[in-house]
A protein has these predicted regions:
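N-terminal intrinsically disordered/low-complexity leader segments
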Residues: 1-15, 194-203
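Helix-turn-helix
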Residues: 19, 23, 27-61, 65
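Amphipathic alpha-helical segments used for helix-helix packing
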Residues: 100-126, 137, 162-169
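Amphipathic alpha-helical packing segments from all-alpha helical-bundle domains
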Residues: 119-158, 177-188
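Hydrophobic alpha-helical connector segments
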Residues: 79-106, 142-146, 152, 156, ...
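Amphipathic C-terminal alpha-helical segment
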Residues: 110, 138, 157-174, 187-199
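Alpha-helical DNA-contacting segments of helix-turn-helix folds
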Residues: 61-70, 124, 128, 132
Length: 203
């Protein structure tokens, strides 16, 4: 759906930029990067190319900002509640993450599948995984986690992305079932690594 030029002109600068980033995310995750140009993007959004260049100096800068905005939205949506026990923190973050995936299924699928060929996407996903792993380890361990725990958590994050891709493709299990499956696999991986956290102490 295109947004008309007048509606953009009525917006303040921050709101206009936010909407441009949202539309940019839709376009960059639904089409190959090389197929898009600033002219095509401006036409799809429904604004002039000059206005688009007013906010972003070029396609690469626009692309990178849309990725950064997506990562920030993910961080905010999945921020755990530190007042909850560790397992409840993980459940809450997983619920928020799966809701975001469900709401943006096509974009998520395209983002994951584009990672192999687009360095910026690959780097962003790696950054998000590292930050998520750190969150999980800080929630589960009161002291420096053992190396096996770090390895298990990082491996689990790759599993989670694969499971989410399968879920949005088939939609044959409930979101809560997937959340519990992911949580069970994480705990199982830590147990298998002989690095199961003391949840009573962590809480």
């Amino acid at each position: 759906m295109r947004v008309s030029s007048p509606s953009y002109r009525r917006l303040d600068i921050d709101e206009r930029r936010r909407q441009l980033l949202e539309r940019g995310a839709e376009l960059f995750t639904s089409r190959p990067y090389d197929e898009l140009s600033m002219s095509k993007i401006a036409t799809e959004i429904g604004i002039s190319k000059a206005l688009l260049y007013h906010y972003f100096p070029g396609k690469q800068a626009y692309f990178e900002e849309t990725l950064s905005a997506w990562a920030e939205q993910l961080r905010e949506r999945t921020e755990p509640n530190p007042n909850l026990p560790p397992i409840e923190q993980l459940k809450g973050s997983l619920d928020a993450f799966l809701a975001l995936v469900s709401e943006n299924a096509i974009a998520y699928k395209n983002l994951m599948r584009s990672a192999a060929g687009v360095a910026e996407i690959r780097e962003l996903i790696e950054e998000v995984r590292l930050r998520t792993a750190q969150r999980i380890l800080e929630a589960l361990y009161t002291q420096e986690p053992p190396p096996k725990a770090r390895t298990a958590v990082n491996g689990w994050l790759w599993f989670m992305d694969g499971a989410c891709l399968n879920w949005i493709e088939h939609r044959d299990i409930e979101r809560e079932e997937l959340r519990d499956l992911l949580l069970g696999v994480l705990m199982g991986a830590l147990l298998a690594a002989d690095a199961a956290p003391d949840l009573a102490q962590a809480s």
